[in-house]
Curated annotation (Swiss-Prot):
Disruption phenotype: Mutant accumulates coproporphyrin III. It holds the Pfam family Ferrochelatase. GO terms for cellular component: cytoplasm. It comes from Staphylococcus aureus (strain NCTC 8325 / PS 47). Fe(2+) binds at residues 181, 263. Coiled coil: none annotated. Disulfide bonds: none annotated. This is Coproporphyrin III ferrochelatase.
Length: 307
């Protein structure tokens, strides 16, 4: 008889419509309503990328691709998909409660973030665990997949494809900027999180397996908390690299993210490009993983390694 299990895919979430922006932002700020100025700034950013972020649709597509691939990988298990979001409905708790209502007693959880930190992946897992404990649901968590061969292969291919667009004689004047979402330094140090080291490892593997000669690690999209966050910021890094090495081409791979959304479409494609334009360098940013089979396969391989 086929065993029935849940697949809980967890993600940050994004507003579905403009009226969602205020409650969404309020949830991110732990219930503190944003000022009109902060709210307008966020609305302007969404407007700049063409309205709202494509994140919601892509997250749904990624979750569908994952459950489909997982059901092909396990002949003796039937996985049912549940989507749980951090800052907007359906919330993580709603998804776990629905599992219970459906009679699910065991599930695999995956966060759509390749690198582990207690602030990000750990907080999703904690919320899922707390809700699951109410119903006696057993959860097995995927903690990360930043070094999975297929994940690295995806990014290596993208770097090489981008390099192929650049004249060969300029490859020595090209730098790859590998980045992830910045997090508060104090939290990383307090919890002894492996987050910065995991990003460094991803960058090293891409450098080893691709044709890129120069590589740098940066952080992006930091919050406005008044406390130090991980750095250098990718914009500052771009200027520093240009001043020191006069690179002609900058390739940005925000490997800490898994699809096109506000942080990539605005923070990279607008803010980093503005810096490149200002210094007279060329800006490149390969396509994000989205539902690419190598990306989906990397997560499936990580699940196979723990379940």
């Amino acid at each position: 008889m086929t065993k029935k299990m849940g697949l809980l895919v967890m993600a940050y979430g994004t507003p579905y419509k403009e009226s969602d922006i205020e409650p969404y932002y309020t949830d991110i700020r732990h219930g503190k309503r944003p000022s009109e100025e902060e709210l307008q700034d966020l609305k302007d950013r969404y407007e700049f990328i063409g309205g709202l972020s494509p994140l919601a649709g892509t997250t749904d597509d990624q979750a569908d691709a994952l459950v489909s691939a997982l059901n092909k990988a396990y002949a003796d298990v039937e996985f049912k998909l549940y989507l749980g979001l951090k800052h907007i409905s359906p919330f993580i708790e709603d998804a776990v409660e629905q599992m219970h209502n459906d009679g699910i007693t065991e599930a695999i959880t995956v966060v759509l973030a390749p690198h582990y930190s207690s602030f990000s992946v750990g907080s999703y897992d904690k919320r899922a665990d707390e809700e699951a404990a109410k119903y006696g649901i057993q959860l097995t968590h995927v903690k990360h997949y930043y070094e999975q061969p297929k994940f690295i292969e995806y990014w290596t291919n993208k770097v090489n494809e981008t390099l192929a667009q650049i004249p060969e004689e300029e490859h020595k004047d090209t730098v790859l900027v590998v980045s992830a979402h910045s997090l508060p330094k104090g939290l990383i140090e307090k919890n002894n999180d492996p987050y910065p080291q995991e990003l460094e490892h991803t960058a090293l593997l891409i450098k080893e397996q691709s044709n890129i000669e120069h590589i740098a690690i940066g952080w992006q999209s930091e919050g406005n908390t008044g406390t130090p966050w991980l750095g250098p910021d990718v914009q500052d890094l771009t200027r520093d690299l240009y001043e020191k090495h006069q690179y002609k081409n900058f390739i940005y791979t925000p490997v800490g993210f898994v699809c096109e959304h506000l942080e990539v479409l605005y923070d990279n494609d607008y803010e980093c490009k503005v810096v490149c334009d200002d210094i007279g360098a060329n800006y490149y940013r390969p396509k994000m993983p989205n539902t690419h089979p190598l990306f989906i396969g990397a997560i499936i391989d990580e699940i196979k390694s723990i379940f």
